Each structure stands twice: as C-alpha cells, then as structure tokens.
C-alpha cells in the first residue's frame, strides 16, 4: 500500500486509462498528497479519489455500497445517476453556504451586515459582484481545512464538458458585464473631474439684465467681515543701532517706530525737502519721552544709517526667497483674501477693493504738498465705522477692542469708514470696480454724457451769446465754460490756504497762469496756459481761441496783479449751478467724459484702415487713445527703465532683421533650385521658405509697431482716460467690428470692470 504512494501522476493516469478494473486497487494516499493533487487538477483528483480506499469509515462504507450497485441492472444505473446528481447538489449547497458564512462573518467583523447579494448586480461601493469562479479560493480553503470532507465521485466526460461549457458561459455573461460597467465608470471619471470645477465656478452676476433699485437705494442686504488692520510694530534687533550726535541712543518703542518710517525713506528725494523734514521732526517729537525730547533737538544730528541698511537687507532677503517661501506667503495672502476680501450683497458674493487698513507712515502727498512728512497715525478699531444691513452678522472687532459705530445705511455704498488725521478727510473701504454698484455708476456716467450729446449744440450757442453779455459775471462764466468744453479743463475746487497743494482748475486760474499772444507761430489769438493741474502735474498748452474769447480775457486781466484771480466773479458753486440749469446731472466731469468719448470715436473712424492687420489696428487704437489723453492732460514722467527697455527692443528688432535677411537668401536659393530641378519636392521647399519669410516679416512689423507705440506713449498715461473717461462700449464695438481680440485692448482687471459693456454691445454701437 505504501508503494502505491510512490506512483507519480502520469503513471496513475495511464493505469486508469488502460484498464477500468484498476479502479478497486488497494491503494491509499495520505491526506496531504490527496489535497495537493486536488489543487492541481480538480477533475482528475475527483476521479482518483473515487477509486481510493479511504482511511475514514464513512468513505469505506460508501465505496462498498457503490461496488454493489455496479453489478445491478439498468434501473440500478439510473438510480446511481440520480443519487450522484443529488450528491452533487448537496455538496454545492454546502459550499455556497460556507462561502456565504465566511462573507457574513467578515462583514460582521467590519461592523455592518450587508443585504443578500443579487446575482450579477454591482455592489453599492462600486465594485462588481464576483462570478462563480471567484468563489473557488473559498472552496479550496474549505477543502483543505475540513478533514472530514468526503471524497468526490467520478464525473463522466459529458458532465465535465457540460461544466466547462457552463463555466465559459458564466465567464462571458457575468465577467464581461461588470467589466463593461467598470470601464464605463472609469471613462466617466475624467468627465466628472472636468465638470467639477465648472460647478464650483461662480456664475458671473449679470446685474445689467435685472431691474434697477428705486432711486437712492444701493442694496437690500450687506454682510462682510470688516477690515484687516496693519500688523503691530516689531521692535528692531539689538544689533541695529540709532545714533544721535555720534553716540548710540536707545529709543522708546513709539519713537523707534516713527524713526523707522524716516529710515525707510532715507534714500528718497522726500527726505531732502525742508518741509518734509520739518513736519516729520515736529510729529516725531510728539511720540518721544521727555528724556528723548530733551536729548534729540536737531534732526541733522540723527543717524538712521543702520536702520536704513537693515530694511534694505530685509528687502533684498525677500527678493532672494525660495519658491517654497514665496508660495507660502502667497497662500497666506489668498487665505486672507478669501476671508476678508469678499462681501455678500443681495445674495451675491462681491469682491472688496481695499479691505486692508493702510499702515502708519509718513504722509507724502502730491506735488509740493504743505503737509508732507507728517505722521499718519495707526488706525485702531475704535476709529472704525462699520456699515452693514440690520439682519446681517456684524463683524467682530479684534479681541479687547470695539468699533466706533455700527450703521445700517443702504443709501451709501461703503462698507467701512474712518477719518484720517492729516487732512481730516474720510476714508472708505469700497467694493471692487467690477462690482454691481461700481458698474452701475459707470454706466450711468456714460449715459449722462450721451444725453449731453443731444443738447451740446444748444449749450454752445448759449455760451457764445453770453460772451457779449453786459454782466461781467455772465461773461466770465461763459468763457470758463468754453475752456471746460474745448480744453476739457477741470472746474477746480475751492481750497483752504495751506491745507493742500497749490493745484489749479478752470475757476481758480490766476492772471499769472496765462499769457495772451495776438499772433504766435502763424496763428492768431493764441492763449498760452501754464499752471499746476491735478496731482501737481503741469498743464502747458498753446491754444488758438475765438476772437471774442481773446478780447474778454484781455478785459478780465485789466488792472490785476499776477496773483489775482482771472475769473474774480466766478467760483465752482456758481458754475455747477449754471450747468445743472442747462441739463440735469451736468457737471464739468460730464463735459470731459463727453469730449473724451466723442474724440475716441472720431479718431478711431479716421485712423482705422480696413486692410490693416491686428497689430496695426492696435497701434491705431492707441493713437486714438493718446489723442484723448492729451486732451485731458493725462501726462506722466517717462519710466526710469524707458531707455533700457527701448534698447532691448531695438536689439530684438535688429536680430529679427538679420533673421529675415537670412530667410530671404534661403528663399532665393530655393527658387533657383526649383527652376533647375522642376520637381514637387523643391516646390514644397520654396513654399516652406516663403511661409518662413512671411512669418518673420510679421514678427518684425509687430516689434517695430511696439517700438513706435512705446516712444509715442513715454510721457502720456493712456490708462486714466481708458478707465475713467472713455465709454467702453465704443472700444468693444470697434473690437467686434474689426476682429481685434478684446484682450489686446483691455487687461483682465479692465475686462472685469467693463463686463457689462462687453456683454451688451454689438459692433454698430454709436456713442
């Protein structure tokens, strides 16, 4: 018997095929060997195990009963088949139960009990139900673990084929279907990922398509988080010293903070100006202790060098930061913006323009401002007035502080306000230019300017008649209105002496600001203007005027000193009241807006050539814009890097010219080859070279246009008029008419600001 265990698989199988009588040989296999063979080939193991003499009593008994039934008649054979089928079904049910018990046990261990599995249906968790073949490992595990498991009977060839066929059908029917489902799921995933951001994107609020609020009402609901205050002062390191009269001096925290403001500007032109130094020293002494006041009596003896070097080093260190450090700062700023940079207005999330309170520092002002150098004090929560709706959550002040006041005024557009200490003016936190409130204000401004178009001829006729009036007051008003209309001058506000810089508008012109020339440069009746305009920008212009205007100016200047007012019977109040009488809503700014927009529209019609390419059309647009900027006196100092940038641009132009010359030589050579060869290949080469030449010519033209544009704009600020005085619908219509991408004219911020114009305007729009 033990010798039979040494037979290999092939010998056993050969003996089985040669003679069926070997079925009842007395050979036994130990349990481990039997299960190993069962694992390799299930069907073969079943056949062998049937003819084995089991060591278990149940197996021997069953084997004897089978031998008896072998010699019975046909009816006994049928009974045997029936018995085998029943036995097969019983084992199948036991194993399915075993597999089910294992699954239930596992699910209970995981803390849940799942519902019965439905055949061929996917699980709730997204996985497909395993087919019958997937249960095999559980069966094998069961066979190996159960020592009392009964040996399997021989399967006939038909039964084996039937099982194989069913197995293949199950594979085709059950496996393929879930695979397809899984495949579909995988294919759908990228679509879901693509759609997700779209859902998260906020839909642009088309407020211009909605009904407007009643007059005076700005909003119905307003909620925000309040302002972000400047960080507290961080004292200087001990190694950074302040010197007075050559000796080290330790400053108190308040005095040190103000000293750092001056140190940061040490290399700036401001710190050399006497008025700046005087105002700074006066305010600095207010922050000193008594001992410091007694010691520090002369600003010239103060040495801020180490402080200045420290801040320069800090600035340089920020420039040398790693990408990771810069990214961290960017993320912190974005987090701050997300929390404080938006408000909810009438169920829409609106961007806030300036949610950070300006830090303390030294006032600079524009031009030669009399208050430059004064200390801008730190704004505290106790200075702040909050504005929100009654049903909104009031923003919380910083711990240990409280707001000055909380208001619920829906007739104003500001969210936060406070009074600054230099001019005593009120500062505001407002919404971004792309918001509904700002957009509506812009739209209304340009519509008012369009209304002026209908009555401007009548107004012009009226002020021409008034030049002949018997009243000096009426004559002065008429000449001032002529200047506002023709030269786009600002009206000019009344100012308290010594409070602001000496800037001039139309009504505040003095005799010293104009010179009269009966003839100049071949033109008659020329008025030469020279005065400091807004932001102390010099306004210089020589303008030929009508004879009656010239005569009136001579009359206004009679018996006056240079510092006397030119229009001594006129002020802005009188002028504005007269403008309101002429047309509701009319101001000097409306005249500027009207003249700027009309000028742009006329210039675009004159300068745009239909056959020009896009870069040339953009140059035409910038030239039209430049005409408006000159009209409105929107000047600027040439950028510090202007010469360097022009040199770089010229280098690019020269390099492009060299490339173009090489490309043209290559084209000439290719054409010569094509004449000789006369084949398709050389023709293709010629076409390729032609395209290369055309491409380089276009690139060169773009660079040359860019150079021309920069040179012409070096002292002209195009942005001010584009943002504040030019009806954006003129630009949008022009872009649509001539196929110029709007991105070439408006940057992202400007496109957001003028979204209403971009959406509603077609190419036929007329201002």
Curated annotation (Swiss-Prot):
It is an enzyme of class 5 (isomerase). Its EC number is 5.6.2.1. The modification Phosphoserine is found at residues 2, 10, 59, 114, 508. Residues 427-428, 490-495, 587-589 are annotated as: Interaction with DNA. Residues 24-39 have a biased composition (Basic residues). Residues 1-201 are annotated as: Disordered. There is a cross-link at residue 119 (Glycyl lysine isopeptide (Lys-Gly) (interchain with G-Cter in SUMO1)). There is a cross-link at residues 105, 119, 155 (Glycyl lysine isopeptide (Lys-Gly) (interchain with G-Cter in SUMO)). It catalyses: ATP-independent breakage of single-stranded DNA, followed by passage and rejoining. Residues 434-767 form the Topo IB-type catalytic domain. Residues 1-23, 40-110, 131-168, 181-201 have a biased composition (Basic and acidic residues). The modification N-acetylserine is found at residue 2. Sumoylated. Lys-119 is the main site of sumoylation. Sumoylation plays a role in partitioning TOP1 between nucleoli and nucleoplasm. Levels are dramatically increased on camptothecin (CPT) treatment. Phosphorylation at Ser-508 by CK2 increases binding to supercoiled DNA and sensitivity to camptothecin. One of its GO terms (cellular component) is protein-DNA complex. The record marks 318, 366, 414, 445, 503, 534, 576, 634, 652 as: Interaction with DNA. GO terms for molecular function: ATP binding; chromatin DNA binding; DNA topoisomerase type I (single strand cut, ATP-independent) activity; protein domain specific binding; protein serine/threonine kinase activity; protein-containing complex binding; RNA polymerase II cis-regulatory region sequence-specific DNA binding; single-stranded DNA binding. It is found in: Nucleus, Nucleolus; Nucleus, Nucleoplasm. The modification N6-acetyllysine is found at residues 174, 282. Signal peptide: none annotated. The keyword DNA-binding applies. Belongs to the type IB topoisomerase family. Monomer. Interacts with ERCC6. Interacts with TPRN; TPRN interacts with a number of DNA damage response proteins, is recruited to sites of DNA damage and may play a role in DNA damage repair. Eukaryotic topoisomerase I and II can relax both negative and positive supercoils, whereas prokaryotic enzymes relax only negative supercoils. Releases the supercoiling and torsional tension of DNA introduced during the DNA replication and transcription by transiently cleaving and rejoining one strand of the DNA duplex. Introduces a single-strand break via transesterification at a target site in duplex DNA. The scissile phosphodiester is attacked by the catalytic tyrosine of the enzyme, resulting in the formation of a DNA-(3'-phosphotyrosyl)-enzyme intermediate and the expulsion of a 5'-OH DNA strand. The free DNA strand then rotates around the intact phosphodiester bond on the opposing strand, thus removing DNA supercoils. This is DNA topoisomerase 1. The gene is Top1.
């Amino acid at each position: 018997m033990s010798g039979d265990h040494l037979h290999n698989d092939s010998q056993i199988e050969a003996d089985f095929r040669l003679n069926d009588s070997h079925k009842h040989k007395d050979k036994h296999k130990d349990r481990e060997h039997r299960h190993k063979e069962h694992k390799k080939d299930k069907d073969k193991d079943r056949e062998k195990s049937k003819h084995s003499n089991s060591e278990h009593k149940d197996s021997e008994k069953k084997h004897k009963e089978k031998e008896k039934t072998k010699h019975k008649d046909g009816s006994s054979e049928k009974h045997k088949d029936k018995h085998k089928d029943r036995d097969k079904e019983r084992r199948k049910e036991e194993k399915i139960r075993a597999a089910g018990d294992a699954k239930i046990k596992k699910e209970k261990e995981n803390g849940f009990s799942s519902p019965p599995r439905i055949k061929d249906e996917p699980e709730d968790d997204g996985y497909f139900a395993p087919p019958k073949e997937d249960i095999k490992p559980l069966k094998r595990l069961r066979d190996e673990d159960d020592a009392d498991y009964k040996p399997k009977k021989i399967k006939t060839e038909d039964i084996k084929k039937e099982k194989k066929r069913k197995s293949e059908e199950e594979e085709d029917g059950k496996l393929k279907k879930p695979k397809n489902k899984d495949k579909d799921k995988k294919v759908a995933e990228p679509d879901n990922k693509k759609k997700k951001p779209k859902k998260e994107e906020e839909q642009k609020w088309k407020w211009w398509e909605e009904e407007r609020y009643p007059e005076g009402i700005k909003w119905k609901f307003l909620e925000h988080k309040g302002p972000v205050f400047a960080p507290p002062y961080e004292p200087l390191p001990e190694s950074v010293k302040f010197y007075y009269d050559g000796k080290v001096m330790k400053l108190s925290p308040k005095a040190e903070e103000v000293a750092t403001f001056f140190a940061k500007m040490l290399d700036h032109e401001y710190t050399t100006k006497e008025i700046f130094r005087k105002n700074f020293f006066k305010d600095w002494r207010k922050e000193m202790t008594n001992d410091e006041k007694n010691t520090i009596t002369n600003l010239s003896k103060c040495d801020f060098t180490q402080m200045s070097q420290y801040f320069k080093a800090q600035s340089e260190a920020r420039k040398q930061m790693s990408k990771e450090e810069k990214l961290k700062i960017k993320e912190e700023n974005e987090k701050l913006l997300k929390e404080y940079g938006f408000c909810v207005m009438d169920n829409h999330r609106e961007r806030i323009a300036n949610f950070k309170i300006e830090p303390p520092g030294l006032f600079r002002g524009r031009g030669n401002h009399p208050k430059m150098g004064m200390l801008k004090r730190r704004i505290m929560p106790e200075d702040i007035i909050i504005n929100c709706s009654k049903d909104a959550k009031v923003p919380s002040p910083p711990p240990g502080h409280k707001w000055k006041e909380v208001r619920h005024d829906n007739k104003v557009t500001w969210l936060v306000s406070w009074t600054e200490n230099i001019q005593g003016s009120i500062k505001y936190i407002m919404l971004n230019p792309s918001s509904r409130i700002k957009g509506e204000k812009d739209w209304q401004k340009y519509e008012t300017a369009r209304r002026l178009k209908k009555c401007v001829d009548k107004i012009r006729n009226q002020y021409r008649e008034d030049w002949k009036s018997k009243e000096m007051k009426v004559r002065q008003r008429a000449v001032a209105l002529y200047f506002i209309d023709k030269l786009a001058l600002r009206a000019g506000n009344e100012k308290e002496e010594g409070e602001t810089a000496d800037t001039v508008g139309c009504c505040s012109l003095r005799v010293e600001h104009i010179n009269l020339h009966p003839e100049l440069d071949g033109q008659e009746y020329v008025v030469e203007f020279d005065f400091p305009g807004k932001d102390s920008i010099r306004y210089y212009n020589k303008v030929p005027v009508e004879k009656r205007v010239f005569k009136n100016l001579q009359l206004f200047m009679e018996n006056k000193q240079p510092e006397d007012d030119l229009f001594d019977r006129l002020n802005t109040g009188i002028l504005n009241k007269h403008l309101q009488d002429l047309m509701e809503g009319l101001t000097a700014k409306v005249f500027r807006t009207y003249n700027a927009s009309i000028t742009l529209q006329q210039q675009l019609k004159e300068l745009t050539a239909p056959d020009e390419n896009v870069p040339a059309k953009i140059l035409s647009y910038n030239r039209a814009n430049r005409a408006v900027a000159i009209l409105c006196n929107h000047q600027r100092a040439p950028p510090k890097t202007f010469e360097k940038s022009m040199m770089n641009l010229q280098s690019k132009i020269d390099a492009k010219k060299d490339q173009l010359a090489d490309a043209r030589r290559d084209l000439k050579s290719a054409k010569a080859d094509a004449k000789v060869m006369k084949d398709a290949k050389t023709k293709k080469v010629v076409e390729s070279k032609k395209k290369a030449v055309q491409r380089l010519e276009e690139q060169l033209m773009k660079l040359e246009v860019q150079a021309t544009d920069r040179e012409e704009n070096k002292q002209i600020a195009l942005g001010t008029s584009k943002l504040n005085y030019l009806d954006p619908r003129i630009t949008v219509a022009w872009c649509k008419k001539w196929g110029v991408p709007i991105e070439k004219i408006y940057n992202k911020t400007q496109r957001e600001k003028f979204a209403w114009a971009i959406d509603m305007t077609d190419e036929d729009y007329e201002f």
